């Protein structure tokens, strides 16, 4: 479940024809809520997990979302993907990642498989678009994704953080471990972003050249 405020999205982007990227969209559960408050936006949702492919094809038509069974990363081509498995009697799969889980990760994973991967930069060039807002949940791979942002500068970026100790090579941690990795902050700040909100698990970055209202996070 995403904790991005629907009121924040509605106040800043309602009735605007923005381009919204939902990267790591899972089964489009949160995407449908974003669509409900931004009816004039164009949505692009990305999820490489095979288990969600069929349901996402159906839901994307129902919700009016452009769905792509891709991973977004710093690689154009194929990349190894580590799928989670259902935990006990849980109805929904846990988070998956392009990074191999470490011993600190309590989630059970199946056999990794290859998935298609694209960068934000190459996808935008191919489709002649540029995102105005990005919601991203990619289990420690956020830094890799934004390394290939290219010339694109979304007005806002909402990142669902994950402790990088849970995945090999993962970055962007807010879970109070001994050593905190702030490389994602540094990268986005170098692109002109400011940290508007940060919690143990989430961060909101706003580009300094835009004026978005963030009263929900004050």
Where are these regions (language model features)?
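Phosphate/nucleotide-binding beta-alpha loop and adjacent structural elements of enzyme active sites
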Residues: 1-218
């Amino acid at each position: 479940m995403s904790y991005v405020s629907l009121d924040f999205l509605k106040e800043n982007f309602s009735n605007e024809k923005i381009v919204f990227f939902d990267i790591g969209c899972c089964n489009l559960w949160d995407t449908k809520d974003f669509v409900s408050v931004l009816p004039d936006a164009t949505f692009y949702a990305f999820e490489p997990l095979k288990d969600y492919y069929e349901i996402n094809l159906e839901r994307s038509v129902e919700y009016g979302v452009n769905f792509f069974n891709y991973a977004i990363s710093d690689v154009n081509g194929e990349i190894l993907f580590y799928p989670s498995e259902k935990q006990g009697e849980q109805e929904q799969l846990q988070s998956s990642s392009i990074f191999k889980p470490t011993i600190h990760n309590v989630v059970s994973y199946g056999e990794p498989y290859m998935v298609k991967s694209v960068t934000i930069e190459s996808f935008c060039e191919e489709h002649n678009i540029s995102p105005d807002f990005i919601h991203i949940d990619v289990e420690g791979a956020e830094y890799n994704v934004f390394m290939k942002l290219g010339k694109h500068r979304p007005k806002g970026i909402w990142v669902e953080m994950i402790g990088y100790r849970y995945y090999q090579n993962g970055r962007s941690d807010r879970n109070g471990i001994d050593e905190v990795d702030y490389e994602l902050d540094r990268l986005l700040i170098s692109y002109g972003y400011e940290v508007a909100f940060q919690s143990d698990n989430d961060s909101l970055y706003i580009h300094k050249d835009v004026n978005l209202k963030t009263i929900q996070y004050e």
